[in-house]
Design a protein with these regions (language model features):
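A short, internal acetyl-CoA/4′-phosphopantetheine-binding micro-motif in the GNAT/acyltransferase core
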Residues: 55-64, 93
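Short glycine-rich hinge loops at helix-strand junctions in the catalytic core
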Residues: 67, 84, 115
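C-terminal "cap" of GNAT-fold acetyltransferases
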Residues: 47-48, 93-95, 101-108, 114-135
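Conserved acetyl-CoA-binding loop-helix of GNAT-fold acetyltransferases
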Residues: 59, 65-78
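Conserved acyl-donor/pantetheine-binding loop and adjacent beta-alpha core of acyl/acetyltransferases
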Residues: 12-56, 98
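Conserved GNAT acetyl-CoA-binding A-motif
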Residues: 80-100
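Conserved N-terminal entry element of GNAT/NAT acetyltransferase domains
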Residues: 1-9
Length: 135
C-alpha cells in the first residue's frame, strides 16, 4: 500500500492525514489538540504548560495492519518534538472498566458502518505510540 503523510495545522489543532498515492483518498486521520494553559488537569494528572494531546486516530479498514496508524503516530511524535511539546499519553483501563468507552459504542458503529476503525483515549493509542517510538 503506497501512501504519504500530509500535515494541516490550525491555531488549536493539527491534522495528520494519510493519503493513498493511487486513489488520492484519505485512508487515515489523526487529530492533535494543542493547549497552552499554564496548568492542565487531564485524567487526574496535573501537568505543565504547552501540552498537546491526541484526540483521535482513525484509519480506513483497508489500511488496518498496514502500518498507516503507526506512520501517522510517528509524524505526530516528530511534531511534538519540533514544537518541544509534552505529549500526555496515559494508559487507559480495559474497555470493560471504562464506562466512558462503553458509551461510545454508537460512535464505534457509526465509524464501522462507513468503513473506519476508531480509536480514541484508549489503550491501543498508547500501545501504538510505544511501537512508534521503538521502531
Amino acid at each position: 500500500m503506497n501512501y504519504y503523510i500530509e500535515v494541516i495545522e490550525t491555531a488549536k489543532y493539527c491534522y495528520i492525514n494519510a493519503i493513498d498515492c493511487n486513489t488520492k483518498e484519505r485512508i487515515g486521520k489523526l487529530c492533535i489538540e494543542f493547549n497552552s494553559d499554564d496548568s492542565v488537569r487531564y485524567k487526574d494528572i496535573c501537568v505543565g504548560n504547552n501540552i498537546g494531546k491526541i484526540i483521535y486516530v482513525i484509519t480506513n479498514i483497508s489500511a488496518c495492519g498496514k502500518g498507516v496508524a503507526t506512520s501517522m503516530l510517528k509524524k505526530a511524535i516528530e511534531i511534538f518534538n519540533d514544537y518541544n511539546l509534552y505529549l500526555n499519553v496515559v494508559p487507559m483501563p480495559r474497555q470493560s472498566e471504562n464506562k466512558k468507552f462503553r458509551n461510545k459504542k454508537g460512535l464505534m458503529r457509526f465509524y464501522k458502518k462507513f468503513g473506519f476503525v476508531h480509536y480514541t483515549e484508549d489503550i491501543c493509542v498508547t500501545t501504538m505510540f510505544r511501537k512508534a517510538y521503538l521502531n
